[in-house]
């Protein structure tokens, strides 16, 4: 289905229920050192642009050559967002950076539209050419997922992504499959020898549950 996000199509191939959608972004805002007060003002501006109802106060402070500000909030679609601002200075470098972590545990009608909207808003905070926007889909499998099932599920997911598998690691309590898909990389951001899709399974013996995580660490079309 053309309206689906490639990661959504891949996840559906696994047959597992999608339980959460997370994004992680980190970017440089400018080449200046900002005080904690200035970061707090910036945090309030970001809160308005993200249309957040804050669930925590803005926490800010200075620690020598480092200043910071952070807060959490929630959007109307139940996306929980954590914003972190950090500014540092030295004899060689002044820099302010922004980190944004989002998580949504509800069922979304259009994941592609949701992710594209988030990415447009988040990347709009910076003019940097090297903004990372990672996407993580997660769910659970009841019991311990054996190697054969990991191979089967990763194969189904990677075929939907037209991905070439570049790595497969088996460990006692967890497995990792990595691949490269041209459906996910933006032009000139990843080389063929790298990977831009990763499937991780981690067995939690106390709950007899295997956590399944499908992640793309870079930009997406």
Set out the residue ranges of the language-model regions:
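Extracytoplasmic beta-rich ectodomain segments of secreted or membrane-anchored proteins
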Residues: 59-149
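Short, flexible beta-strand-to-coil junctions
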Residues: 30-32, 75, 88, 101-105, ...
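N-terminal leader/presequence regions that precede the main folded/catalytic core
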Residues: 1-80
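Short, hydrophobic/proline-enriched secondary-structure or compact coil segments at domain edges
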Residues: 20-29, 92-102, 210-218
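Short beta-strand-to-loop capping motifs
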Residues: 28-33, 102-104, 139-141, 181
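A cross-kingdom marker for long, charged
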Residues: 185-221
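Intrinsically disordered, low-complexity segments enriched in Gly and acidic/Ser/Thr residues
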Residues: 140-194, 199
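Extended intrinsically disordered, low-complexity coil regions enriched in Ser, Thr, Gly, Ala
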Residues: 33-58, 109-114, 145-169, 207, ...
């Amino acid at each position: 289905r053309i309206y689906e996000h490639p990661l959504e199509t891949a996840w559906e191939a696994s047959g597992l229920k999608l339980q959460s959608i997370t994004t992680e972004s980190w970017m440089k805002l400018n080449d200046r050192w900002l005080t904690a007060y200035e970061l707090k003002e910036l945090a309030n501006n970001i809160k308005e642009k993200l249309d957040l109802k804050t669930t925590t106060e803005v926490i800010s402070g200075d620690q020598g050559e480092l200043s910071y500000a952070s807060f959490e909030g929630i959007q109307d679609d139940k996306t929980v967002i954590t914003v972190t601002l950090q500014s540092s200075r030295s004899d060689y470098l002044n820099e302010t950076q922004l980190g944004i972590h989002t998580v949504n545990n509800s069922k979304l009608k259009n994941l592609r539209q949701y992710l594209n909207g988030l990415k447009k808003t988040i990347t709009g905070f910076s003019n940097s050419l090297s903004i990372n926007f990672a996407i993580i889909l997660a769910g659970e499998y009841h019991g311990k997922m054996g190697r054969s099932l990991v191979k089967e599920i990763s194969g189904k997911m990677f075929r939907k992504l037209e991905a070439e598998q570049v790595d497969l690691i088996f460990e006692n309590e967890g497995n990792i499959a990595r691949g490269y898909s041209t459906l996910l990389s933006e032009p000139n951001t990843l080389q063929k020898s790298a990977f831009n899709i990763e499937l991780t399974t981690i067995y939690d013996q106390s709950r007899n549950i295997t956590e399944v995580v499908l992640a793309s660490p870079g930009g997406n079309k």
